[in-house]
């Protein structure tokens, strides 16, 4: 679905090093790939290059078999929906309903189909009761849900999230992550998320780590979380379940190898307690 080959980019020619330096990776159709790393590692730059908002110095970006060029950029943008950290910058409609319908109006969809898509999208993210509200009067989590509804209505094949959950409280963050997974499952969207959030990373199929503009590793979330204290050097926290698992192992209370999810850790503890 997305193939990146030997991508190089710098914001100005005075930079002594590239923001992205020979980056290559791929994202399969229907996959959720998270990109993580320290601030300045090139995560958001990668998202903007794929979305055609920036132009690479060299390398190739291929989306759905089509190489991104000046001639194809608008075709490729039609296949991609992007949600940023601050959704206020994306709102254009006077009401929630108007905002979700905006992109469909620009595409010239028949009125009945447009109404149907808007209602379906708002219902999917639980915002139908807010359709007549001004977007500015919504909470942060509600604003992000409206932004995602606008993308659902457009039916792109790729959803790019650029720190979309970073401004939300823990409950709102968890709700949004679940909505994204539901969208991926129901609509078959490919998801690319730029994030520091461990819950978001845990939901993904694979995780790409960028370090100083280069690909440091590509692995499953489980493999990444098993790296323990190395995660701090990569701009991530150590998952609570990993810290607790290590302490329990040190005390001889559980016997396991590698990272355990919270669910797996609970199962291990129940097994231990049942033997007491």
Swiss-Prot record:
It holds the Pfam family ABC_tran. It is a peripheral membrane protein. InterPro entries: AAA+_ATPase (IPR003593), ABC_transporter-like_ATP-bd (IPR003439), ABC_transporter-like_CS (IPR017871), ABC_transpr_CbiO/EcfA_su (IPR015856), ECF_ABC_transporter_ATP-bd (IPR050095), EcfA_1 (IPR030947), P-loop_NTPase (IPR027417). It is found in: Cell membrane. Residues 2-237 form the ABC transporter domain. GO terms for biological process: riboflavin transport. Changing residue 90 to A: No effect on ATPase, 10-fold decrease in riboflavin uptake. SUPFAM superfamilies: P-loop containing nucleoside triphosphate hydrolases (SSF52540). The keyword Oxidoreductase does not apply. Disulfide bonds: none annotated. ATP binds at residues 37-44. PROSITE patterns: ABC_TRANSPORTER_1, ABC_TRANSPORTER_2, CBIO. Its EC number is 7.-.-.-. It comes from the Bacteria. It is an enzyme of class 7 (translocase). GO terms for molecular function: ATP binding; ATP hydrolysis activity; ATPase-coupled transmembrane transporter activity; riboflavin transmembrane transporter activity. GO terms for cellular component: ATP-binding cassette (ABC) transporter complex; plasma membrane. Its main location: membrane. Keywords: ATP-binding, Cell membrane, Membrane, Nucleotide-binding, Translocase, Transport. Belongs to the ABC transporter superfamily. Energy-coupling factor EcfA family. Forms a stable energy-coupling factor (ECF) transporter complex composed of 2 membrane-embedded substrate-binding proteins (S component), 2 ATP-binding proteins (A component) and 2 transmembrane proteins (T component) upon coexpression of the components in E.coli. May be able to interact with more than 1 S component at a time. ATP-binding (A) component of a common energy-coupling factor (ECF) ABC-transporter complex. Unlike classic ABC transporters this ECF transporter provides the energy necessary to transport a number of different substrates. Expression of the complex plus RibU in de-energized E.coli allows riboflavin uptake. This is Energy-coupling factor transporter ATP-binding protein EcfA1. It comes from Streptococcus thermophilus (strain ATCC BAA-250 / LMG 18311). The lineage of its organism: Bacteria, Bacillati, Bacillota, Bacilli, Lactobacillales. The gene is ecfA1.
């Amino acid at each position: 679905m997305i193939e990146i080959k030997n991508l190089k980019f710098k914001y100005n020619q005075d930079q002594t090093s590239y923001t992205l330096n020979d980056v290559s990776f791929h994202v399969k159709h229907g996959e959720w790939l998270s990109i993580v790393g320290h601030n300045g590692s090139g995560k958001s730059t990668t998202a903007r290059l794929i979305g055609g908002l920036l132009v690479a110095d060299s390398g190739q970006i291929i989306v759905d078999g089509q190489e991104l060029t000046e001639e194809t950029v608008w075709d490729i943008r039609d296949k991609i929906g992007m949600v940023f950290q601050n959704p206020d910058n994306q709102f254009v409609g006077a009401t929630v309903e108007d905002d979700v319908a905006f992109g469909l109006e620009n595409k010239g969809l028949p009125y009945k189909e447009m109404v149907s898509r808007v209602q379906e999208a708002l219902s999917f993210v639980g915002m139908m009761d807010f359709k007549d509200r001004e977007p500015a009067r919504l909470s942060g989590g509600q604003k992000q849900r409206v932004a995602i509804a606008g993308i659902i209505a457009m039916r792109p094949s790729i959803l790019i999230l650029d720190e979309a959950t970073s401004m939300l409280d823990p409950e709102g963050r968890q709700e949004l992550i679940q909505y994204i997974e539901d969208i991926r499952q129901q609509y078959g969207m490919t998801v690319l998320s730029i994030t520091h959030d461990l819950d978001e990373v845990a939901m993904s199929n694979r995780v790409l780590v960028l370090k100083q503009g280069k690909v440091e590793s590509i692995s499953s979330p489980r493999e990444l979380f098993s790296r323990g204290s190395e995660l701090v050097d990569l701009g991530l926290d150590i998952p609570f379940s990993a810290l607790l698992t290590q302490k329990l192992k040190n005390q001889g209370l559980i016997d396991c190898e590698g990272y355990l999810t919270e669910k797996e850790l609970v199962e291990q503890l129940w097994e231990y307690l049942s033997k007491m």
